[in-house]
């Protein structure tokens, strides 16, 4: 649904950010979804600023395979034990390249316009998507989902700027 909203709203200059929140049906699943903020300092102002700029990641210990986007199989981390997710240290753009740096990550799926455009294993905690190697004419955004056996961390959309935004 989020990708559908993005493809409908971005042409009008409206970015829809994704959030994660626990929808626990048992006490063992409390706090199974949460947010990571890329904070310079811990303050209400810094959190708000990150939210306004999309400098945060959603995280979940439960991921249902849809057959289109997401893992090949459902992910359900065990209840009541430490379940470390991928630790994103940076997501940067330089020219037409997007680079993800993350620890404790197995692979990343790059998604654009609701479709997986690339899947990469992280090499030394790093993966780079080179947009020059892809057909980007209709691409509105790129986002990524970072997986390990305990769940998934997802980025906010990186809007493709062609200099004609409303």
Residue ranges of predicted features:
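C-terminal functional module detector
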Residues: 10-18, 22-166
């Amino acid at each position: 649904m989020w990708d559908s909203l993005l493809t409908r709203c971005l042409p009008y200059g409206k970015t829809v950010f994704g959030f994660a929140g626990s929808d626990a049906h048992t006490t063992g699943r409390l706090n199974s979804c949460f947010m990571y903020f890329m904070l310079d300092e811990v303050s209400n102002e810094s959190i708000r600023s990150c939210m306004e700029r999309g400098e945060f990641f959603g995280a979940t210990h439960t991921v249902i395979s849809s057959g289109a986007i997401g893992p090949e199989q459902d992910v359900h981390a065990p209840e009541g034990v430490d379940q470390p997710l991928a630790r994103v240290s940076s997501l940067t753009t330089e020219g037409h390249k997007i680079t993800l740096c993350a620890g404790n990550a197995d692979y990343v799926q790059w998604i654009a316009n609701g479709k997986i455009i690339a899947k990469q294993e992280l090499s030394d905690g790093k993966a780079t998507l080179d947009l020059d190697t892809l057909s980007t004419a209709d691409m509105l955004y790129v986002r990524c989902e970072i997986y390990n056996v305990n769940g998934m961390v997802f980025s906010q959309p990186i809007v493709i700027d062609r200099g004609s935004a409303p």
